[in-house]
Amino acid sequence: MGRGRVEMKRIENKINRQVTFSKRRAGLLKKAHEISILCDAEVSLIVFSHKGKLFEYSSESCMEKVLERYERYSYAEKQLKAPDSHVNAQTNWSMEYSRLKAKIELLERNQRHYLGEDLESISIKELQNLEQQLDTSLKHIRSRKNQLMHESLNHLQRKEKEILEENSMLTKQIKERESILRTHQNQSEQQNRSHHVAPQPQPQLNPYMISHQASPFLSMGGMYQGEDPTAVRRNRLDLTLEPIYNCNLGYFAA
């Protein structure tokens, strides 16, 4: 006995409606996948549940490419069918709004998928594509990280080399200044030693060997006579006394 015909009307029971939606959605996604393989067709499917949850399927690797292709085709077709410029402008604005809104929703959905959220409605092929995209992103991230680490390492090595050269230069300058200070200190010590050396004793001379100046001779009853520069120095006093004939003392022979 075959299955009876289902009446096409809204299911009032929420649980039955949710169960029917899940079954029909899975069948719809399966049919879309089959027709894309059997007929080599480019198929994209977008479904929103009564709660606003998005479910999609795309035979291509990226849904954005399919949407952009659809927008270009739809825009070109409407351009030919709308001769009125005013209507054409309104149509363009409506299309632009719809395009941007769909793109925002798609970006938000992809962001949730990249964070590991709302993965229940994704097929195996979409999960594989998501995994491939994440692997590619991780490769780019690791490559960029390694590049930055290599550049940072090179910068640190150059900085280390500059610091070592600067330290070597400072060490050389310090040694030169220490050498100059030691030289000045040695010179100062030598000068101090030369100033503090005891004077050597002078040889003592025999007083009898010293030639004295001839003392001026005294002449009693006469005038003071100085030294004759041509006369020979004498070391004794020459006194000349005249004979005294006075005071009844007799006379003294000269």
Curated annotation (Swiss-Prot):
List the SUPFAM superfamilies: SRF-like (SSF55455)
Q: Which keywords are on file for this protein?
A: Activator, Coiled coil, Developmental protein, Differentiation, DNA-binding, Flowering, Nucleus, Transcription, Transcription regulation
Q: Which InterPro entries match?
A: MADS-box/MEF2_TF (IPR050142), MEF2-like_N (IPR033896), TF_Kbox (IPR002487), TF_MADSbox (IPR002100), TF_MADSbox_sf (IPR036879)
Described function: Probable transcription factor that promotes early floral meristem identity in synergy with APETALA1, FRUITFULL and LEAFY. Is required subsequently for the transition of an inflorescence meristem into a floral meristem. Seems to be partially redundant to the function of APETALA1.
Q: Does the keyword Disulfide bond apply?
A: no
Pfam families per the UniProt record, alphabetical:
K-box (PF01486), SRF-TF (PF00319)
Q: What is this protein identified as? A: Transcription factor CAULIFLOWER
The subunit structure is: Homodimer capable of binding to CArG-box sequences.
Ranges for domain MADS-box come to: 1-61
The lineage, from the top, is:
Eukaryota, Viridiplantae, Streptophyta, Embryophyta, Tracheophyta
Q: Identify the GO cellular component terms for this protein.
A: nucleus
Q: Give the primary localization class.
A: nucleus
Give compartment(s): Nucleus
Domain K-box, chain residue ranges per copy: 90-180
Q: Where is this region: Disordered?
A: 182-205
Identify the domain of life: Eukaryota
The UniProt record's further free-text remark is:
CAULIFLOWER may contribute to the shape of the floral meristem. This trait has likely been selected by early farmers during the domestication of modified inflorescence structures.
The record's GO molecular-function terms, alphabetically, read: DNA-binding transcription factor activity; protein dimerization activity; RNA polymerase II transcription regulatory region sequence-specific DNA binding
Q: Which organism is it from?
A: Brassica rapa subsp. pekinensis (Chinese cabbage)
A single Gene Ontology biological process assigned to it is: positive regulation of transcription by RNA polymerase II
Note whether tRNA processing occurs among the keywords.
Answer: no
